[in-house]
């Protein structure tokens, strides 16, 4: 498991009864996580310091309950990267801190490559954590997401990190349609990142289902890889999918186009002052 243990502005303070107690900068939030199936709190007193807690509804969805006054939006830093945080519907804050392990990896790959130009394609790019990381490392990025709101948020993160003059394109579109257009245009990328949802809809209502569509998308993306690709990353939070499946998909697709090293595993977040680690999804990586 790759553990995101280089954070200073984000911490898991405790975990119990299906909730994780997190510190985002100076703000303390309690959010649900189905993997926390134990009941015992390690630090009961810390739960009294909560700014807001997200309650899941039995009928789906849920709502935030605010205990203390807090800003609607604030910032946290990861190394030289700055992200805008705001609690929104369905428990999210606009950032997945466990992805820091992938940001570190891709930044190192880009910087150590010593190439003059590296073009990155970031699919299902959300609020742009990977976009910001790759721009900071010196790459150019094409950021694709079907949500206008998330894309605006990603632009804010780029500006907050002082990277607005770096070469970045923001595309609001269905990922599959966009990749097909790039194939027709003959555009190529040295690195591809994708963080597909379990289920989602494109900009015009196109349906995405992970199990049904992931293999075809990865295979499609091999047509926009350059002749000398640097890396290919798949992230997934889809329940019931093993990381080995992502590894196998990369071996059957990307590794046939360009021989490299394929690895996979889990990503996790450590709890402060504890040996506990919260599993937070899986990854598959192809790299030169």
Enumerate the language-model features and the residues they cover.
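S-adenosyl-L-methionine
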Residues: 147-193
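S-adenosylmethionine
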Residues: 175-255
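C-terminal catalytic and target-recognition region of SAM-dependent MTase-like enzymes
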Residues: 229-288
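Conserved SAM-binding loop of SAM-dependent methyltransferases across substrates and taxa
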Residues: 127-139
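Non-catalytic substrate-recognition/targeting regions of SAM-dependent transferases
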Residues: 7-22, 29-97, 104
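Conserved class I S-adenosyl-L-methionine
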Residues: 116-126
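Conserved SAM-binding motif I beta-strand of class I
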Residues: 140-145
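Conserved alpha-helix/loop element of class I SAM-dependent methyltransferases that forms part
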Residues: 97-114
